[in-house]
């Protein structure tokens, strides 16, 4: 019983809800064998012929290319495109492509050279010895994409189904009423299709392989059964003709009885589907080493005199293909790419054939009625009954017209396979599929904008995070630079701090700085007291100077300031010498009458010569020598004139003016000391001579002594305390002399 149930389930097929039965027009092209066509004058190869981004161009204008040579680089989900023939790259520019919008895309224009030479082809005939990754990479670089209409990269699809795939379905249903490309391919190339299926089986390792084909293709069914032979790993399933039984979800339901959930792919239930044309392309890429450069295209319609299926190179202009089918171009031709239900009208006949192009329909005026005027929806629900995906076409229509994108998305708009069954049964002639396509495009554009905005936000956040990290790193470096100093730097800093502390302590000892409070009045008492002390000191010094001046009598000899302590020492030595001489003279002249001496002294004024200080030490030495000579002469005269009367001595002393020799102080302390020593020696000699000549008459001695002029040095007021002390000493000596003179006069 279980075996019977398994056998029944093994050969059983299921049905799907909805669907339509349009009139079939396959016989126009299915009876004509595949044929090759001449090369066009130029090929137009769009860079994007698959679902995904376009590749990076790797050729330049003027380059020579060979058939099968890559024109773009394929990375990730980006498939490369290849040169369909040998020739020259004439241009790289925008060109109208096979799309309902009629927009232009970047394309490569190649002018064929007529030789149709192949580039180096890399084959993997022993693919069973190759790894899975090697096979997938080979398929990717060959540019293999789904030829059933979706254009999804085959390698990426297989990569996603490597795990959990239990059933591999080969789609040969081809449910469109006019298209016979897969039919003719299965009739003529069944063996190669089976080889491609074997490669897929090697990659996926499924538990079973099902080949689905509609019952309206008897020749193809026979060819496949012949190619399969007695194979048990592949099963051929013939299904009833119903549109759209060729859809992926619908064929999965028919062959397995499983339904693909909303928003999911068939791989979610362990099923993977490939088209028979894709299997054939896989065989050529792996066994023959040929990339995808051509495919089978159906030329059909009553406007063609020679309908059929041809091998069309990718990039061939539609105009060239229609010309090969005997199409007469009218003023306003109507050409549909694809079938009458899922196809679209071409905006121009210069658009090229791409990987997903499987049919060119050129109907006559009677074959296809003109587009009727669109009417309002009457909510008859026929579209809902015909929808094979179980959607609500009328609700999607209202959402699309009202730009209610989220509601349309929530009602599973993207599960619509755009089969056109709803529009086919609509009594109001509403082109529902066009509304759905437009709504899908708008939602995709919104999603792309949102994705770009999200990416921009991510980049902005990353930039802000990077700036924050850089800022934190800078602050950390600054902190490390501020704290991480070397030992020498620490020593230098410590020494500087010690100096500052010493200065602060010194300042505190001399006078503590005044602390300034923010809200208090400044306390200047210390500064005021210091200023008062300085003023008192100045007043005391001035009073002391005035008292000294009052006690000191007026000196006839003007004094000049001594600029140097050495000069003051010389002046002091000279003063002492003069004092000794005056004392000796006073003692010698004690017996002379006072009246005559006084009268003679006052009779003639003493000529005082203002002396100048020598400019250098040599002048000082000369002055000292002159003084020594005069001292010797004075001593000699004193000895000779000892018997002279005192009166004559006094008169002679006063009669001659006293010659004052200007002396200069030596600039060196040593010279000043020498001069002082010489002066002391002279004083001792004079004292000895005075003692020897004590018996000589006083008058003659006095007259001889005073006869020579006495050198009087004019002193200057010293600039410092030492000079002041010298001046005071000189004044005291003069005072003593005056006192002695007064006492002698009284006697």
From Swiss-Prot:
SUPFAM superfamilies per record: alpha-helical ferredoxin, Nqo1 FMN-binding domain-like
Where, per UniProt, does this protein localize?
Cell inner membrane
**Pfam families per the UniProt record, alphabetical:** Complex1_51K, Fer4_7, RnfC_N, SLBB
Membrane topology recorded in Swiss-Prot or TrEMBL: Peripheral membrane protein
Question: Mind naming one GO cellular-component term on file for this protein?
Answer: plasma membrane
The keyword RNA-binding is assigned to this record: no
Enzyme Commission identifier(s): 7.-.-.-
Question: What EC class is this?
Answer: translocase
**Which residues are [4Fe-4S] cluster 1-binding?**
377, 380, 383, 426
> Where are the stretches annotated Disordered?
538-564
Q: Give me the residues that bind [4Fe-4S] cluster 2, please.
A: 387, 416, 419, 422
Annotated GO biological processes are: electron transport chain
Task: Name its co-factor(s).
Answer: [4Fe-4S] cluster
Q: Which residues form the 4Fe-4S ferredoxin-type domain?
A: 368-397, 407-436
Q: Name one GO molecular function term.
A: electron transfer activity
Please share the entry's free-text remark on the cofactor: Binds 2 [4Fe-4S] clusters per subunit.
Keywords in alphabetical order, please: 4Fe-4S, Cell inner membrane, Cell membrane, Electron transport, Iron, Iron-sulfur, Membrane, Metal-binding, Repeat, Translocase, Transport
Q: How does it assemble?
A: The complex is composed of six subunits: RnfA, RnfB, RnfC, RnfD, RnfE and RnfG.
Q: What does this protein do?
A: Part of a membrane-bound complex that couples electron transfer with translocation of ions across the membrane.
Family recorded in the similarity comment? Belongs to the 4Fe4S bacterial-type ferredoxin family. RnfC subfamily.
Annotated protein name in UniProt: Ion-translocating oxidoreductase complex subunit C
Gene (name only) = rnfC
């Amino acid at each position: 019983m279980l075996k019977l149930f398994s056998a029944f389930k093994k050969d059983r097929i299921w049905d799907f809800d909805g669907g339509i039965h349009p009139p079939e027009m396959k016989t126009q092209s299915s009876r004509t064998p595949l044929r090759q066509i001449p090369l066009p004058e130029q090929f137009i190869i769009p860079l994007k012929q698959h679902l995904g981004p376009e590749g990076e161009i790797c050729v330049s204008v003027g380059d020579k290319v060979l058939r099968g040579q890559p024109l773009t680089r394929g990375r990730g989900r980006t498939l490369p495109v290849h040169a369909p023939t040998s020739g020259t790259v004439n241009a790289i520019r925008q060109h109208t492509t096979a799309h309902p919008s009629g927009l232009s895309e970047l394309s490569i224009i190649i002018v064929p050279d007529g030789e149709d030479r192949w580039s180096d082809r890399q084959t993997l005939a022993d693919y069973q010895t190759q790894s899975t990754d090697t096979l997938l990479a080979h398929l990717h670089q060959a540019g293999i994409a789904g030829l059933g209409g979706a254009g999804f990269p085959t390698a990426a699809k297989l990569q996603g189904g490597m795990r959990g795939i239990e059933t591999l379905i080969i789609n040969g249903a081809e449910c469109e009423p006019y298209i016979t490309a897969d039919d003719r391919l299965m009739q003529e190339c069944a063996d190669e299709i089976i080889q491609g299926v074997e490669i897929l089986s090697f990659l996926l390792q499924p538990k079973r392989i099902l080949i689905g084909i509609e019952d309206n293709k008897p020749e193809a069914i026979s060819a496949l059964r012949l190619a399969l032979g007695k194979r048990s790993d592949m099963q051929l399933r013939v299904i009833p003709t119903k549109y759209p039984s060729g859809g992926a979800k619908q064929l999965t339901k028919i062959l397995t009885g499983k339904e693909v959930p909303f928003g999911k792919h068939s791989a979610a239930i362990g099923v993977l589907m490939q088209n028979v044309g894709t299997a054939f392309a896989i065989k050529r890429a792996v066994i023959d080493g040929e990339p995808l450069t051509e495919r089978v295209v159906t030329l059909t319609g009553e406007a063609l005199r020679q309908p059929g299926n041809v091998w069309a190179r990718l990039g061939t202009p539609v105009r060239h293909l229609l010309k090969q089918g005997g199409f007469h171009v009218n003023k306003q031709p109507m050409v549909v790419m694809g079938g009458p239900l899922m196809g679209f009208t071409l905006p121009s006949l210069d658009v090229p054939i791409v990987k997903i192009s499987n049919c060119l329909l050129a109907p006559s005026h009677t074959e296809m009625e003109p587009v009727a005027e669109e009417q309002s929806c009457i909510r008859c629900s026929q579209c809902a009954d015909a929808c094979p995906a179980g959607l609500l076409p009328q609700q999607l229509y209202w959402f699309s017209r009202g730009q209610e994108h989220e509601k349309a998305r929530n009602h599973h708009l993207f599960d619509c396979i755009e089969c056109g069954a709803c529009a086919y049964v609509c009594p109001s002639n509403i082109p529902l599929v066009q509304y759905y396509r437009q709504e899908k495009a708008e939602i995709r554009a919104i999603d792309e904008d949102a994705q770009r905005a999200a990416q921009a936000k991510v980049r902005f956040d990353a930039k802000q995070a990077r700036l924050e990290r850089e800022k934190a790193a800078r602050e950390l470096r600054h902190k490390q630079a501020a704290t991480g100093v070397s030992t020498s730097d620490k020593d230098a800093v410590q020494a500087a701090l010690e100096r500052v502390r010493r200065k602060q302590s010194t300042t505190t000892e001399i006078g503590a700085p005044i602390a300034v409070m923010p809200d208090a009045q400044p306390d200047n008492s210390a500064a005021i007291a210091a200023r008062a002390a300085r003023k008192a000191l100045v007043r005391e010094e001035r009073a002391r100077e005035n008292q000294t001046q009052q006690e000191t009598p007026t000196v006839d000899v003007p004094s000049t300031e001594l600029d140097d302590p050495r000069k003051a020492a010389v002046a002091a030595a000279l003063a002492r010498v003069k004092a000794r001489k005056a004392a000796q003279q006073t003692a010698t002249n004690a017996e002379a009458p006072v009246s005559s001496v006084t009268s003679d002294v006052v009779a003639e004024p003493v000529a005082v010569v203002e002396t100048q200080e020598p400019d250098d030490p040599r002048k000082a030495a000369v002055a000292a020598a002159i003084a020594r000579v005069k001292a010797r002469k004075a001593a000699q005269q004193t000895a000779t004139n000892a018997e002279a009367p005192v009166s004559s001595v006094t008169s002679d002393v006063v009669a001659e003016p006293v010659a004052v020799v200007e002396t200069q102080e030596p600039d060196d302390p040593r010279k000043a000391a020498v001069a002082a020593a010489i002066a002391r020696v002279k004083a001792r000699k004079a004292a000895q001579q005075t003692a020897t000549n004590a018996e000589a008459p006083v008058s003659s001695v006095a007259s001889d002594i005073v006869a020579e002029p006495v050198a009087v040095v004019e002193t200057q007021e010293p600039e410092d305390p030492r000079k002041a002390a010298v001046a005071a000493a000189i004044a005291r000596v003069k005072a003593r002399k005056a006192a002695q003179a007064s006492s002698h006069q009284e006697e």
